[in-house]
């Protein structure tokens, strides 16, 4: 009975204590609200603060004692500087509205942040709190995402916090695609390049849109070409370099500058060509663009935009064209006539022909071998003399779409819903490995750093990114990204890919240019 009475007494005491605390809190809030109301009524106020951010001014009648007790900045202002004798004090601040909210919090008032989106108010608040010498919370800063128009404000805040291993990745994550990176010092660029993806993915869609994505699947920008008419029978494209893409649509050929989003040139179109152009290669040394149509190859000089040569050597439709990775004075064509033709790119004469059933082909990394694939086997030929070097049976259930030379000795064949990996020269991993894929692919391309394999699906509006850097035992980590329109079909045709390209982003290009410039300057000073 005594224990029960004791418990009851303790419960009553707790209730009384809680009630007392609530009364005290209510009284405190009431007194703070009353004190704040005095600022509105100008009762007992002894200083007028004018907050000026350059765009707007906010005037507040306040109490020095409250300001000085809550903020060291105001304590010093009222005791150590000439403003201590002034009744009206003007203060230049980052934002008058946010600073006024901070001062209102000295009176225990809830702040109204509805005038700004959360990210903007948060950044402005850090700037204003820092100005007043008050602490700020950085928990949200680590995950902040700002729109393009907020990037400069983000940089202003990083200037306050400092450029550290914590803040530089935040800058990298929020970098606008077209930002003028020359504003950055070289030291910052050297740090940013560690965190920024190095390459952009370009997808040329069948609706006449050139879309840009980063490696994480985020769309960066789009360029709308004038080829948006459903009467167009075909639409295809080829990347010339990191700035130019040539776009074919019916009897029009335009060279687009993808940096400036403008048509840089129009190419002369061949007379009486009734079949579509399908396969392309670019020869940087003589600035020639080569394309195939039916049995013929066509050569444009991009210096003059003129068609300079038409050559017919194959006896059936040409199904592929590839330029040597080490010497663009040579390229190879394959056709349905099973002819594999090696060309001199200076004279446009055939140097050598080999006969072998072939669906797709690629050069080795050294440029000394040709690797050809059909649904039954893989063959390797010596480029210089055409001798047969290697053969391996594979027996695919469908003809392969393409073959990619991923790195020295490692090749990827794309067929049906699989990726097949094999090695040449043979080694202990020589047996082929099949990786099941979410869909059939029509195109595949590696980023120049060989870290990512981007595959373009044929039956869905996705592209897949395989992370080669974490691949173990030939198993890739795959991420799929929705891209909206089908990028692997052409109007009225099902079997042609339009365009899947990789370009360096502007930060990577700037870093390489600045690094080269610094090396040249070093050579000049220290020959």
UniProtKB/Swiss-Prot annotation:
Q: Which residues form the signal peptide?
A: none
List residues of the BTB domain: 45-115
Mapped WD repeat ranges? 215-266, 272-310, 313-353, 355-391, 436-476
Write out the entry's keywords from A to Z. Repeat, WD repeat
Q: Which domain of life is it from?
A: Viruses
Q: Which Pfam families match?
A: BTB
Gene3D superfamilies membership: Potassium Channel Kv1.1, Chain A, YVTN repeat-like/Quinoprotein amine dehydrogenase
**Family membership:** Belongs to the mimivirus BTB/WD family.
Q: What name does this protein carry?
A: Putative BTB/POZ domain and WD-repeat protein R783
Organism from which the protein derives = Acanthamoeba polyphaga mimivirus (APMV)
The organism's taxonomy opens as: Viruses, Varidnaviria, Bamfordvirae, Nucleocytoviricota, Megaviricetes
């Amino acid at each position: 009975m005594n224990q029960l009475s004791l418990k009851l007494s303790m419960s009553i005491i707790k209730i009384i204590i809680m009630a007392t605390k609530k009364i005290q809190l209510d009284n405190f809030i009431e007194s703070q609200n009353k004190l704040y109301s005095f600022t509105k009524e100008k009762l007992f106020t002894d200083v007028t603060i004018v907050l000026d951010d350059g765009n707007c001014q906010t005037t507040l009648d306040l109490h020095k004692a409250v300001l000085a007790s809550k903020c060291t900045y105001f304590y010093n202002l009222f005791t150590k500087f000439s403003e201590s004798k002034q009744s009206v004090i003007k203060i230049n601040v980052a934002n008058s509205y946010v600073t006024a909210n901070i001062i209102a919090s000295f009176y225990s008032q809830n702040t109204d942040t509805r005038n700004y989106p959360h990210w903007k108010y948060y950044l402005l608040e850090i700037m204003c709190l820092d100005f007043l010498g008050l602490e700020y919370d950085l928990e949200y800063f680590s995950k902040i995402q700002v729109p393009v128009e907020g990037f400069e404000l983000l940089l202003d805040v990083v200037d306050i916090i400092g450029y550290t291993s914590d803040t530089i990745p935040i800058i990298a994550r929020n970098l606008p695609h077209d930002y003028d990176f020359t504003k950055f010092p070289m030291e910052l660029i050297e740090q940013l390049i560690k965190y920024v993806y190095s390459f952009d993915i370009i997808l040329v869609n069948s609706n006449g849109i050139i879309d840009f994505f980063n490696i994480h699947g985020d769309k960066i920008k789009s360029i709308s070409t004038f080829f948006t008419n459903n009467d167009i029978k075909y639409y295809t494209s080829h990347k010339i370099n990191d700035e130019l893409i040539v776009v074919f649509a019916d009897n029009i050929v335009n060279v687009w500058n993808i940096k400036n989003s403008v048509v840089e040139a129009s190419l002369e179109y061949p007379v009486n060509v009734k079949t579509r152009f399908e396969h392309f290669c670019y020869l940087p040394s003589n600035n020639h663009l080569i394309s195939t149509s039916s049995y013929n190859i066509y050569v444009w000089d991009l210096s003059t935009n003129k068609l300079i040569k038409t050559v017919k050597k194959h006896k059936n439709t040409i199904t592929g064209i590839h330029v040597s990775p080490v010497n663009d004075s040579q390229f190879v064509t394959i056709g349905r006539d099973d002819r594999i033709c090696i060309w001199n790119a200076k004279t446009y004469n055939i140097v050598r022909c080999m006969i072998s059933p072939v669906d797709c082909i690629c050069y080795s990394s050294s440029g000394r071998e040709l690797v050809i694939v059909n649904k039954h086997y893989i063959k390797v030929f010596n480029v210089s003399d055409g001798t047969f070097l290697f053969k391996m049976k594979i027996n695919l259930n469908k003809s392969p779409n393409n073959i990619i030379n991923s790195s020295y000795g490692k090749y990827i064949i794309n067929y049906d819903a699989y990726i097949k990996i094999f090695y040449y020269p043979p080694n202990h991993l020589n047996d082929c490995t099949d990786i099941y894929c979410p869909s059939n692919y029509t195109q595949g391309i590696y980023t120049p750093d060989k870290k990512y394999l981007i595959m373009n699906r044929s039956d869905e509006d996705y592209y897949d990114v395989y992370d080669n850097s974490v691949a173990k035992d030939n198993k890739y980590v795959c991420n799929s990204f929705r891209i909206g329109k089908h990028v692997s079909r052409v109007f009225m045709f099902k079997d042609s890919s339009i365009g899947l390209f990789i370009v360096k982003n502007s930060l990577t290009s700037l870093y390489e240019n600045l690094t080269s410039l610094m090396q040249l300057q070093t050579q000049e000073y220290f020959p």
